[in-house]
Amino acid sequence: MKIAIIRRKFNPFGGAEQFITRTIQSLSAFDVHASIIAESWQKNNDTSSTSSQDWIEAIVTGSNRAAKFLSFNQSVATILSTNKFDLIQSHERLLGADIYRLGDGIHASWVARLAKVSPWYTKLWLKIDPYHRAVIRTEKKMAKEPNLTYVANSTLVQQELIDWYQVPKSRIVLIENGIDTTAFRPSSQAKKITEKIKLGLNPQLPTVLFIGSGFARKGAFELLEAINSLPDFQLIIVGYDKQLTRIKQRVKALQLEKIVLVTGPQSDVKPFLAVADCFCLPSLYDPFPNAVLEALCSALPVVVTDAVGIADAVTHHNAGMVCERQAASIAQALQLVWKNRVTMSDNALNLSKNYDLAKSSQQWLTLYNTLINNKKENNIAHSTH
C-alpha cells in the first residue's frame, strides 16, 4: 500500500510530526510505504529515507503567509497529479485528499478563540488578514468535498467540525492519538530527588512540567505567573519558541531563577518527565497534545484547560484538573493536584493505557483498507456505466 502524507513543515519536535513518525514506524510492518510531501524537514534519524518512507519536496513561493499557503497547496496538487498513491492523507488544509487529519484543529475556531483574548486592533486584523481568510475559505471548500474523510483526534475537534461547517458525523472518524506506553515509565520518589538535584532544583519542592512549542498559545506565560504566586512550587519549561528569550527575561524580572528552569527544545523529554511531579498545559487551543500522553504514561497528574482535547478524559478519570487560562485558576488547580497527587498519579497511569499506539495504528490501518476498498468499488461501478 502506497500512501502520501502531507505536512508542510516537518519539525521532528512537533506533536503532529511525532505522530506521523510513530504511525509510519508502526505501519511499516503491514507493508505500508509512505511518501511524505513537505516544503521542508529537519534532518534526524527519523527523517531519512527508508524502505518504508521517502520524501518529496513541495516548492513554495510568495512573500507573505497567504501567498505561501496557496503556493504550497498548488505545488502539492501538481505532485499528486504526477504520482500514483493508493491514499492521500493530509495534515494540512488543502483540496484533493482522501483523508484530512485534524491535528491542528479548526482554524476558524482558533481565530475566534484568539480574538476573544486579543485587543481591538488585533481583533480587526484577524477579520481581514489574507492568510486567515485563505485558510478558512479552504476549510469551507473541504467541508463540501463529499469524498473527503475527516479524522478527528478528540471529541472536542469532532464537535467543532460539526458546529462550524455542518460536516455530517458519518464523514468523521474519531481516532485519538496513540503512544508507545512502554517508552515512558513512572519514576520513583528517590529518582525524582536525585534528578532534581542534578538540574539544580530544590529536591523538596513539587515540580511542575510544561512541554510545548508555541508558548503564547499553550499558556506558558500564564503558568509562569501562577508559579510566581506559589513560592513552594518550581517549574520546568521545555520547548522551542520565538519568544524563548522573552520568557527567560520574564523569569529574571520576577526573580524566579531559582525555581524556574527554561531548557529550550529537547530531543529527549524523558529526563524532565522523570523529575516532574505534575504536568501543566493551560492552552488557548490544543486539539490533542502528545505531551499530555507522555505525562500520563509517566504517572503525572495533568492540569489543562477545557480547550485541550483530552480534558474530558482527564476529568472523567480524575487524572488531574481542568483550569481556566488565568494565573489564579492555574495556581489553584496545581495546589489541588498536589494535595491529591497519590490518587491522581495512579489514575493518570491507568488512563494512559487507553491510548496504546497499537490500538490507534490498527484503527488507521482499518481506515486505510476501508477507503481503498471503497475506491475499488467506485471504480468498478464507474467502469460498468
Language-model features: locations:
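A conserved mid-protein helix/loop that constitutes part of the nucleotide-sugar donor-binding site
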Residues: 17-22, 206-229, 242-245
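Glycosyltransferase donor-sugar binding loop
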Residues: 41, 211-213, 234-248
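Donor nucleotide-sugar binding/catalytic pocket of nucleotide-sugar-dependent glycosyltransferases
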Residues: 129-190, 207
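Short acidic/histidine- and often glycine-rich active-site loop of Leloir-type glycosyltransferases
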Residues: 174, 294, 307-317, 321-322
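A short, well-ordered alpha-helix in the C-terminal region of glycosyltransferases
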Residues: 194-197, 206, 342-355, 366
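Aromatic "clamp/platform" in nucleotide-sugar-dependent glycosyltransferases that forms part
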Residues: 265, 284
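Short hydrophobic beta-strand element within catalytic cores of glycosyltransferases
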Residues: 301-305
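Conserved acidic donor-binding segment of nucleotide-sugar-dependent glycosyltransferases
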Residues: 316-327, 336-341
